[in-house]
């Protein structure tokens, strides 16, 4: 992973424009996301929050504008960026036919990790005793925690998370917030969407980007 101890700005957006079905979701949106930042993307349903996250992750192309990682266009440093990026969409990305342990093992190995204790990691998300349970038999909250477990064994600098608190109880949300703070304090950044209020991450620590769409 990239050593960024001397680099402050991790991800930058320059004049990003996104248009969907004759609606301008956002227009010439520019901002810098620095090491230590926790960023919440806000806006009504349909405002383009998920679209913006996907553009920042390099999974979708904007109508106009550019996204940069360490001041280089992500299209020119794709491999380096992907190594330092963890993206979790609003869908859990968990295979129902695999156990919780198998899902975590799969997700960590495809991310390049080979030295980890799946049982210990699952215990951190309150899934101790459910290691061998098929994901398809888990509750919605357990399903989501299975997806989120990889955050507890990850050294990517950039975390992009779409609705990470969905189906998570209050205690679980607080544990995630603490993890986000720890990740930011260690020089990473967290970019997320959520419809829930956060209790631990206060406004003086949280930066917000507001989206409001309009018709062309």
UniProtKB/Swiss-Prot annotation:
An annotated GO cellular component: plasma membrane
Subcellular location(s) of the protein: Cell inner membrane
Gene3D superfamilies hit by this protein: P-loop containing nucleotide triphosphate hydrolases
Membrane topology, from the record: Peripheral membrane protein
Catalyzed reactions per annotation: heme b(in) + ATP + H2O = heme b(out) + ADP + phosphate + H(+)
GO molecular function: ABC-type heme transporter activity; ATP binding; ATP hydrolysis activity
Protein keywords: ATP-binding, Cell inner membrane, Cell membrane, Cytochrome c-type biogenesis, Membrane, Nucleotide-binding, Translocase, Transport
EC number: 7.6.2.5
InterPro entries cross-referenced by the UniProt entry: AAA+_ATPase, ABC_transporter-like_ATP-bd, ABC_transptr_haem_export_CcmA, P-loop_NTPase
ABC transporter domain ranges (all copies): 11-216
GO process annotations (BP): cytochrome complex assembly
Keyword Transmembrane: no
UniProt: ATP binding residues: 43-50
Record family assignment: Belongs to the ABC transporter superfamily. CcmA exporter (TC 3.A.1.107) family.
Assembly mode: The complex is composed of two ATP-binding proteins (CcmA) and two transmembrane proteins (CcmB).
Role, per record: Part of the ABC transporter complex CcmAB involved in the biogenesis of c-type cytochromes; once thought to export heme, this seems not to be the case, but its exact role is uncertain. Responsible for energy coupling to the transport system.
Protein name, per record: Cytochrome c biogenesis ATP-binding export protein CcmA
Species of the source: Shewanella sp. (strain MR-4)
